[in-house]
Amino acid sequence: MDVASFRAIIKAQKAAGLDVERMLAVQNIINDVRSQGDAAVVDYTNRFDGQNYTNAEAFRVSPDRLKASWDELSPELQASLKTTKARIEAYERSILYQDMIGEEISYVYHPLEVAGFYIPGGKALYPSTVLMTVVPALVAGVTNFVVTTPVFADTSITFAALYLCGVTDNVFAIGGAQAIAAMAYGTETIPQVDKICGPGNAFVAMAKRLVNGDVAIDAIAGPSEILLYVDDSIPVDAIVYDIFAQAEHDQAARTFLLCESQSFADKIAARIEALLPTQKRRDIIQASITNNHYSIVDTREHLIAILNEIAAEHVSIQHRDQDEIVAQVQYAGAVFKGYYAMEAIGDYVAGPSHVLPTGGTARFSHGLTSNDFRTANAVINIQHATYDQIAPAGELLAEAEGLYAHQASIAIRKAESPYDEK
């Protein structure tokens, strides 16, 4: 498969996300939440999610319930969540931008006032998404949180992860586009936020797309994807389980598998067929693997062109020349180098957030980090001596642009400062 073919796949995937009928349906939900507040959220949640809420307070999750969820976990699972949280914290602190304080020019950072989080819960429970989104915000200095998560099954482990993070207020058992709208615009019960983060289904993604600009969002997530490049020294079953791990996310997930020989690709295909019946989530995997794409690459140039064209959410390089190859990967949500850096470890305990750009958007965006929960501004404090040096240039530029009040604003300060300044 050539680069143009891969480009067409990505283009088709993006087009599928712009369903007009879905957009209109979601816009109606948003409009209703904006105009009716809690009543609309209750109505849509009962209608779509099979709940029987009578009022908005009914879907507020109490701090006691969150604590009870944590207490119910086994010590081993508590320890696993703590290990994951600690690794995320360490990574996020290591990449947190620091203020630059200069004598005349500074650049300073400020945490967002209120951050909102959507934790999916339809086909599976995702306590890992709690940690991968909330912990970066904590490291950034955010202190006010709003969390929405749909309730379709036992959500205790998701609630437990929130308790571990210290997020025990403004947690709501709702999902869907109505949850996004409620966080974006606020209701009588649900506070308005400054930014919404977290993945969801196609309706959640559309809602985030439509409220973007009224609030900030992390990204518009499409179906999850992985690009695997492997040589024939890698055990076939390990590759198959990497593919299954990607496929079991949901039916729309996809894998791009690049190999050096057709015979090795055939071995992988045969083991997929043999192992699929043994998988607990085989129905989802079976649907997902129909989205897979396989290709044989015979030159390094061809490989790198494909890697950077697809700009996949996850890029896994398990190859004898992996150092050289990874050095040339310019566009990817996250790169997993080597046999022991499988994508599944990145989904849980590696450290970087698993909220990553999909659908080729890694060509211009990056995965969620602590820096995404802060704003920044320059602080400009020009002193008299510097003014004398740079004012003439400013005056001439203002005159050239025909902005004469700008020119006068600069020129009028040639006299001494009215207060003590050097």
Predicted regions mapped to residue ranges:
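N-terminal Rossmann-like NAD(P)+-binding subdomain of aldehyde/semialdehyde dehydrogenases
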Residues: M1-E113
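Short acidic-hydrophobic, aromatic-tinged amphipathic segments that line or gate anion-handling sites
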Residues: M1-S5, N170-G175, Y294-T299
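Flexible, glycine/charged-enriched surface loops at secondary-structure junctions
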Residues: L96-I101, A216, A253-L258, T278-A287, ...
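Conserved small-residue-rich beta-alpha loop and adjacent elements
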Residues: Q98-A160
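Conserved NAD(P)+-binding/catalytic subdomain of aldehyde/semialdehyde dehydrogenases
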Residues: V167-R254
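A glycine- and small/hydrophobic-rich beta-loop-beta segment
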Residues: H249, L257-Q328, A332
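C-terminal core of ALDH-fold dehydrogenases
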Residues: N308-K422
